[in-house]
Amino acid sequence: MVKIKKPEKTPRFSAAGVFLFCVVILTGFTCCMTSVPATLTYSHPFYVRDVPFYPGEDYQCGPSVLASVLNNLGYDIVPEDISREIYLRKVKGTLNIDMVSFARRFEDITVTEFYGDLTLLRENLSMGYPLIVFVDLGIWSIRKGHYMLVVGYDDSIGGVIVYSGAEKDKVIGYKEFMRMWERGGYWALRIAKE
């Protein structure tokens, strides 16, 4: 008589086992993610308060952030007025040189264009100067230039606080911000009263 060996059972995943696996994986991933509180309270000295916010719509980020800074200095101007003068339809945007030239039209202000780093950014913010920066939001070789207004930074959450497009007080992690800013050439613009 020949004995036939029963085939071994292949392990099956029980519903409870799959559920437990998913819980462990998801819990592990959420522990690695940085969470930012829904409402941030900026009580540190590195947030420039009361800077007007103009949402940048349809490639109008340059005129929007420029209007924010100029209004913060007491000039009554809206992004549409700036856009009529410096927005270039062919490039769907505004050039850095035109941003600088427009700001220099105003009396009793100093316009400083520079190539910065995180230290210079922090120094300017701690002196109360919001900074216009040019970043590249594109991926790989696809370029997508964008102006942001940096209004603060917070080391406790590890990021800068910006006005970007339609978002006010958007927090961007240092690593991501520096990557975008590097692709934009680390260009920054400070506009201040003399």
Residue ranges and their predicted role:
Residues F19-T30:
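Bacterial N-terminal signal peptides
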Residues M1-I4:
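Short, low-complexity, intrinsically disordered N-terminal modules
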Residues C61:
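Active-site-proximal loop/helix segment associated with metal-binding centers of metalloenzymes
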Residues E57:
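Beta-rich catalytic cores
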